[in-house]
Amino acid sequence: MESKPSRIPRGISVQPSSSLSARMMSGSRGSSLNDTYHSRDSSFRLDSEYQSTSASASASPFQSAWYSESEITQGARSRSQNQQRDHDSKRPKLSCTNCTTSAGRNVGNGLNTLSDSSWRHSQVPRSSSMVLGSFGTDLMRERRDLERRTDSSISNLMDYSHRSGDFTTSSYVQDRVPSYSQGARPKENSMSTLQLNTSSTNHQLPSEHQTILSSRDSRSSLRSNFSSRESESSRSNTQPGFSYSSSRDEAPIISNSERVVSSQRPFQESSDNEGRRTTRRLLSRIASSMSSTFFSRRSSQDSLNTRSLSSENSYVSPRILTASQSRSNVPSTSEVPDNRASEASQGFRFLRRRWGLSSLSHNHSSESDSENFNQESESRNTGPWLSSSLRNRCTPLFSRRRREGRDESSRIPTSDTSSRSHIFRRESNEVVHLEAQNDPLGAAANRPQASAASSSATTGGSTSDSAQGGRNTGIAGILPGSLFRFAVPPALGSNLTDNVMITVDIIPSGWNSADGKSDKTKSAPSRDPERLQKIKESLLLEDSEEEEGDLCRICQMAAASSSNLLIEPCKCTGSLQYVHQDCMKKWLQAKINSGSSLEAVTTCELCKEKLELNLEDFDIHELHRAHANEQAEYEFISSGLYLVVLLHLCEQSFSDMMGNTNEPSTRVRFINLARTLQAHMEDLETSEDDSEEDGDHNRTFDIAYFI
């Protein structure tokens, strides 16, 4: 079946019971009305104003009951969904299965009514349509037949009703609702109103088959219409006992109330599985519109737990009935967080610590108004109503909360020890023993409660201590047998929140847990200035073993003999003043052999003064001259000119020898030439100190001689 855009308002036929008492679920306790409603033609407007309609009924009285937003979070919540204007067929529908509801309070003989101006309007999110089903098995077929006939009649009002047996067919009239193509916020302010048309029949509607129409207010401008007092009074009389489930089927799911009661547990399991598939998509569309639907601070705190549970599990569990009863019976606000904490252990497991901390903030109601405001804002922030899947998808919205959750989850396991008690020490010498939880399953939920009990016991000891010590003193948690100290800021002494910065300090080895002091005087080194001065003087006055006489600045030795005395070659003073004679000769010879000039040899390298030498058997000028001649001869030989001359002589002698080969005088001449060259080379070898060069020359001349 091809699904069509369902913008068609539909009439609702309800047969009321005369014995039923009218209930007002939220706001407007109402005034008495005539027994009949006068009908008014519904006109569709495309502008920003909403359409208010009235219901027409027969002479028999009927009951008009609907939920406000605070009651939606506690009981059954029928989500009205809007379809897109582009006639797409991908529209998930929510089918609401009605169950038995307990009777409300009697207002009087007159019927409670809602005037045209008192109808609360709600903005329906994008791509959603609400289908309210009643009891009967033939309604599904009529619904399909009706959608086939309504291709082009979008603005026509069609009323249909089905009368079969003990059931009464009911539907709803949905006026124009906003539709937008993108984003989570609506672009117009058009509203939708539910019109209830009742007609008298031969059968009466039993109280257990009562159809309840719910409309949700997502406009923050209508918060003032219903005070938190009226919400609390209506909440105390409300005991919802039914569940709803979300589905993607095109046709509504119709279920009998007796069947739901008999098979309540399997239905909850199946609805849980079906609801989780569509929760992510639906909640992503209404994330922005739902963010402004809190009534007041206190009413949002009361409905915070059930709202988060319903958005997470996608169905309202009968367990909420006990929470609503406990809230109605016990007016104290300090016990409401306890009920929420008990429900929190079954719902959001990752928010146990946050609810525990918010419940702690409610216990300190005796603080100033500024602190109460901080506690209310903190408890409102620490209990997010969106599911974990949406929190993971909406990174810009909830990244700060995820970081705080990770910081808190990383802090709390550090203080979770198994069997020994934690000692929390305060500056006012108060010691509170906090017993560690032994239950591994409830450790995460019990940890904030235990800390709340310990802090309340500490602050409850004396009023002056709770007022002054809780604000001005810090809590330092010292773990026995550990090397870490956890320090909490002083402002959080009496009320712990999740925004806590904990500093970790390493306790030194000399830490004494009895008095809380460390023996720094024992391990610290001595800083006595008198002792340091004595050490410095002793180092300066200490005599060296080698300081008996003057030392040579080259060999660092004293005068050993009379032949090798210490001299003063230059104007250097101190340890460089004296030099041995032998050490000075060796130093000067090394400078001469290095090829230094005479001026560089006779000049001190340190003081740049002329050396005054009177050495025996050591003439610097003669040594430098001899070395200069040797350098010249070596340069001549190294240049190759000598070899060229020698080669020329050999060629002449060889030519003469070749011309007179047979003459013996030629051989004698050649031998004499070789000897002459050998003698000349021997003279050169005597002036060379290199023995290797001598061997090479000798081998060369030997070869020439034997030739």
Curated annotation (Swiss-Prot):
Location of N-acetylmethionine modifications: 1
Biased composition (Polar residues): 66-83, 95-126, 189-212, 254-270, 304-336, 373-392, 412-421
BP terms from Gene Ontology: negative regulation of DNA damage response, signal transduction by p53 class mediator; negative regulation of intrinsic apoptotic signaling pathway in response to DNA damage by p53 class mediator; negative regulation of proteasomal protein catabolic process; negative regulation of protein autoubiquitination; positive regulation of cell population proliferation; positive regulation of protein polyubiquitination; protein autoubiquitination; protein stabilization
Cellular localization per UniProt: Cytoplasm
Pathway participation: Protein modification; protein ubiquitination
Zn finger (RING-CH-type) location: 544-614
Statement: the UniProt record of this protein carries the keyword Nucleotide-binding: no
Keyword match RNA-binding: no
Transmembrane segments annotated in the record for this chain: none
Positions annotated to bind Zn(2+) 2: 570, 572, 604, 607
Low complexity: bias regions: 17-33, 52-65, 294-303, 444-470
Gene3D superfamilies: Zinc/RING finger domain, C3HC4 (zinc finger)
Catalytic activity field: S-ubiquitinyl-[E2 ubiquitin-conjugating enzyme]-L-cysteine + [acceptor protein]-L-lysine = [E2 ubiquitin-conjugating enzyme]-L-cysteine + N(6)-ubiquitinyl-[acceptor protein]-L-lysine
EC number: 2.3.2.27
Pfam families: RINGv
An annotated Gene Ontology molecular function: zinc ion binding
Chain segments carrying region Disordered: 1-126, 157-279, 294-343, 361-425, 444-473
Bias type Basic and acidic residues, positions: 37-48
Keywords of this entry: Acetylation, Cytoplasm, Metal-binding, Phosphoprotein, Transferase, Ubl conjugation pathway, Zinc, Zinc-finger
Phosphoserine PTM sites in chain numbering: 317, 389, 687, 691
Disulfide bonds: none
GO cellular component: a single term: cytosol
Family matches, as PANTHER family: E3 UBIQUITIN-PROTEIN LIGASE MARCHF7, MARCH7/10 E3 UBIQUITIN PROTEIN LIGASE FAMILY MEMBER
Protein name per UniProt: E3 ubiquitin-protein ligase MARCHF7
Organism: Pongo abelii
This protein's encoding gene: MARCHF7
